[in-house]
């Protein structure tokens, strides 16, 4: 298999997902009119309405039946397993990269003759098994620290501020000094904390057990020249992981003992209401922030400075959103699904929905003329032009969903004071070896 995460970085920015294994034999039966039909199991809850609207419009234009079902946050793997076991299984689904593909390889049709593959600006970003194109990314995504410009400008104007402009915040040490000072002066700034709540409800915990955990993996893999899923990790940069997580806990809107029930919506609301200056999330968050009343000139995004190579560190950019066509579906349904995808990425309706309404940045040539309206995407594009090194999405190599969950549980226990950091180390290092072995036994 050849899939180069770092070549994906060379394109541009914007959701996160995880997908797992199933060994069922579901297939999809085509509709009676011979046109085939489409069933898309969508990963992104925040784009559910937009996908349903696209399905309705496509059916209106072509007469082809399109069904869209959306998995609740954190349940995609479970729902995909369930749906694939049915007679009318999804004709279109997603995997997160090579690890997800390994679990679903018997269900992936060759997409080399489909429009999404043909439209790729850089065909290296496709997911391949030998010469077979098994998945095509439809969103290049970026995350970091979203920041509120007006709150930071207010802080920069204070006497004794640890930074005088956003350009001064270019390292972990400066970021922490600013966050600590903002927390101490929160009444002057009219905020509840420097950072939004680090919630560990399933709608939020992925930000820490997956996205933040990507950074120690990235730096370890860079140092050790790891290019494929390793059987074990050392945890070389766990001290830096702890430093950033501690900052999130100490300089927060919320007492750490309350984090187990805090949600993604809570963090989004805190940030949109101006209760916090920093919010770890990605380009996909713009639609929710916009709905909450934020304006494009209110926000931008900084790297999650990790204290390893801050001078060169850029935002975290990659893809975990690969479309796959179900090879078990009827030929008519596979053709109908490919035709639907062609319409989605080449029609005015589809391009507008994906780029504007969903706020995604795609790797397709057909989107070249799209004006960027998402300020977080603009930050990602600017970051790529900065000469800095974008951090790869190495969490695609995480061995299992269980590894993430065990790490998340250890992080929450640590945050609440009911566990210690050694348990986080154990979940990270020992848990990796255990889950890798379980996934590769036999």
Question: Model-found features: residue ranges?
Answer:
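Short helix-initiation/N-cap motifs at beta->coil->alpha
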Residues: 70-79, 170-174, 259-273
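Conserved N-terminal structural module of periplasmic/extracytoplasmic solute-binding proteins
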Residues: 3-14, 18-19, 23-100, 113-116, ...
